[in-house]
Amino acid sequence: MIDAGFWFEPVEFESRTLGGAITAEEIHTIAAVARSELTGAFTGLNIRFSNRRDLTYRVRVVQELRDMRVRWKTGVPAESRAVPGFGGQGSVSFSWLASAAVAYAPDGADRASIVDAIGRGIGRAAVHEFAHLLLPRANIDDASDINSYEYRSAARSEQYFGELRWGRVRPLLRERIPTCAE
C-alpha cells in the first residue's frame, strides 16, 4: 500500500462571475470534490490518500504558484518534483485553477456548478501531479488526448467540465502500484 498526502493550505477566491468571494462551506465542497476526483482516478490501485504532510508522496493545494524558471511574474497551475526511489512533492494553484474554472464555465452555469468545477479542476491537476511523482521517469504529459488526466495543460474546459479518463499512463501505474486484488 502506498500512502500519499493531499491537503489544502488556507485559500481564498473572489470572482464577479460568482458574485463575490467563495465561502468556507464552498471551500469544504471544493476540497471534497477534489478528493473524490483524486481517489476515483486511482480506484483499484493500492494507494491511499490522507491529509498527512509527512508522506513520501504528497501534493498540497496552495493559493498560487509562480513559475520560478522565468524572471517575470507568471503563474502556473501545478508543479511537482520527484526523485526516483525517494518520492516527491507537488503543489496545485488554487487561484489559477479557480480562475480557469470560472473562465471555462458554460454560459448560464450557476454558482454551485462552478464551485464543483473548481474542485474537479483541482483534483484532476492533483491526479496529474501524483502521476509525475509516482512515475518520475515516465513521460506523463500528452498532447494527443484532451480528455485524459495525462493531457499537458489545465487550460481546457475538459479539466473542469465533463469526464476525464486515463490514457497510456494507467498501465504504467498498474506496474508501479499493485492492484487491490493482488
Describe each PLM feature range:
Residues 1-34:
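Fold-level signature of zinc-dependent metallopeptidase catalytic domains
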Residues 2, 61, 149-152:
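Hydrophobic side chains in beta-strands
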Residues 9-14, 25-26, 37, 64, ...:
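Glutamate identity and glutamate-enriched acidic tracts
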Residues 10, 39, 46, 54, ...:
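Generic intrinsically disordered, low-complexity segments enriched for polar/acidic and small residues
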Residues 21-141:
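Metzincin-family zinc-dependent endopeptidase catalytic domain
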Residues 114-182:
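The catalytic-center signature of Zn2+-dependent metalloproteases
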